[in-house]
Amino acid sequence: MFSTDPVVYCVGDEYRIFFYTRFPSFAKIRVGGTEFDDCRCGIMRSAKGMRGITVPKSLLDECGEYTVCLDVITARVAYGTKTVKTVEKSYAFRPVKSGAPVRAFMTGDAHGNAQRSVKAAKTFGGFDFLIVNGDMSDKCEKTNSFEVAHNVAAELTRGGIPVVYARGNHENRGAAAELIYDYIPLRNGLTYYTFRLGSIWGLVLDCGEDKGDEHSEYGGSVRFHKFRKEQTAYMRELIDDAQNAFAAPGVEHRVVVSHIPFIRDMNKTFTIENETYAEWAKLMFEIKPDALLSAHMHTYEIMRPGSPHARFPAPCPTVVGTECRDGYLGATGLIFDKKGITVDFVRSDGKTVLSEKI
């Protein structure tokens, strides 16, 4: 009945629970004694495929369990729709706790090879939450391209721990790119947002593409300049409301997640948005993150403030953590404790190539 286990994405003060269904059905999720429907504007969704239901983060954290419920449809008609049976499956959920060391795993740049991400995670070992940092598919000509990110997250978490998602530039390429919004977590329809997991506060930014909107590669299909400006305004809003955001009670660590490491120097083709990205870097001095967590470069790097590779001054290290090679995929383990963050660069071939405190 279910194609995979669910994925529980953290967005703001909510969880977005995504799962695939094999048959037309009405879906809901039960947490404690409360049910949440897969419903839009009063109409229950019924098509098979990806489904997404939002539940309050505080409620699921408290209950530690949720149940996915499907009413399987035999006839979806104008008058007298019929369902044949109800299928339920329950999942234990482990929220991120404050205080104790927290282990996170960041993957990205799989470009369609899901199993390499899974193998790299085994090298790192168990973790408390997952970061999926873009370019899990190479292109998005069809909606099944979005299954790579979902399948990796489902296999690594089994619906039992939180996931943070950042869109990569390759998710913007192809005829299906405009349909991704039914397959990923959003905040009010947007791919940038904040999250709070235990004592860790995070901001997800979305650089969009890696070249200018006018580039011939896109053929007029993108408008990311305005989209980036909107994120500048969003960062300013967070700074104005700092006591309810990154300076909220109990916050011990802050991270910014962005597929593209916008602070890093690039070659001429990829050097875009100087004004906007300089402003983002400046605003980060007010947010004071412990790290910028990125992918995109297909390599490993910890770029500290003052590095000759830095395009702009930065208040924190940039961790570029998804090495992509013919024989293996690299990913990053992160261990948050009171002394900082330990970065482990791990590979799908079982090797750990670096462990460094930042």
Indicate residue ranges for each PLM-predicted region.
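Acidic, histidine-bearing metal-coordination/catalytic regions of metal-dependent phosphoesterases
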Residues: 1-105, 342, 347-358
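Core catalytic region of metal-dependent phosphoesterases/phosphodiesterases
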Residues: 62, 117-176
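Extended active-site neighborhood of metal-dependent phosphoesterases/phosphodiesterases
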Residues: 71-89, 147-245, 279-280, 302-324, ...
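An acidic-aromatic substrate-binding cleft motif
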Residues: 81-133, 138
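Loop/turn elements at helix/coil->beta-strand transitions in domains of secreted/extracellular proteins
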Residues: 100-103, 125-130, 158-164, 197-202, ...
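Active-site neighborhood of phospho(di)ester-bond hydrolases with catalytic His/Asp-centered motifs
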Residues: 105-109, 129-135, 161-169, 255-259, ...
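The substrate-binding groove and active-site-proximal loops of carbohydrate-active enzymes
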Residues: 107-111, 136-143, 163, 170, ...
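Active-site-proximal segments of metal-dependent phosphoesterases and phosphodiesterases across multiple
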Residues: 224, 245-291
